[in-house]
Curated annotation (Swiss-Prot):
Official protein name in the record: Somatolactin
Disulphide bond pairs: C29-C39, C89-C205, C222-C230
Main localization (coarse): secreted
Cellular compartments per GO CC: extracellular space
Tissue specificity of this protein: Pituitary gland.
Top-rank taxon, per record: Eukaryota
Subcellular location: Secreted
Length: 231
């Protein structure tokens, strides 16, 4: 039944997938020589709108990917096991506010840098996730394509946020130094159950953080329009 539901969902999403890809506005800021020279020509307002749209799409696709993975590879007892085992997200140690009151109190500068930290923290883990999903028997192309798409769009989002920091805060371009995790450098192959639970945790945590990126960026947009009405 789970497999049938997953297939139904995959067919439905496949029909919408081309529209999802074409609906997003381009955000690629990097020229072929590696310089971030495209986005600086876009107005600050339009760039923020594009960054928000990218964050919205990334969250939506991450939500679909997590649900598809869950339906195909994670029976309900294992879903409960993950919740009870207390798996932690890789970004838990980052100094990023999580409560509504904390988020409302932070500055625009910290909002942007919080988004950038989240984005950069997930670039390398998503590359790992692409590689490990390729080893799954029966992993649908839809899931593989979604993971690859999110990974590529996350890099575009990073570029957009970096330029946005330059425009809004008049700061130099932030360096993109990734905090490598030993979790993704272990050459030993975990057993299938361990691999499934680890990948499920990654997808679930990324979905949560992608939503947080979207919320922070939309709060920033609200502040640009009317700082007193942003809840």
């Amino acid at each position: 039944m789970l497999m049938f539901t997953a297939i139904q969902r995959g067919v439905w999403v496949a029909l919408l997938w081309p529209h999802l890809l074409t609906a997003s506005m381009p955000l690629d800021c990097r020229e072929e020589n590696g310089n971030l020279s495209r986005c600086p020509t876009i107005s600050q307002e339009k760039l923020l709108d594009r960054v928000i749209q990218h964050a919205e799409l990334i969250y939506r696709v991450s939500e679909e990917s997590c649900s598809l993975f869950e339906e195909m590879f994670v029976p309900f007892p294992l879903q409960l096991q993950r919740n009870q085992a207390g798996f932690t997200c890789i970004t838990k140690a980052l100094a990023i506010p999580s409560s509504k009151s904390e988020i409302q109190q932070i500055s625009d500068k910290w909002l942007l840098h919080s988004v950038l930290m989240l984005v950069q923290s997930w670039i390398e883990p998503l590359v790992y996730l692409q590689n490990t999903l390729d080893r799954y028997d029966g992993a649908p192309d839809m899931l593989l394509n979604k993971t690859k798409w999110v990974s590529e769009k996350l890099i575009s989002l990073e570029q957009g946020v970096v330029v946005l920091i330059k425009k809004m805060l008049d700061e130099g371009m932030a360096t993109t130094a990734y905090n490598e995790q030993s979790l993704f450098q272990d050459d030993a192959q975990p057993d299938m159950l361990e691999s499934v639970m680890r990948d499920y945790t990654l997808l679930s945590c990324f979905k949560k953080d992608a939503h947080k990126m979207e919320i922070l960026l939309k709060l920033l947009k609200c502040r640009q329009n009317d700082i007193y009405s942003c809840a």
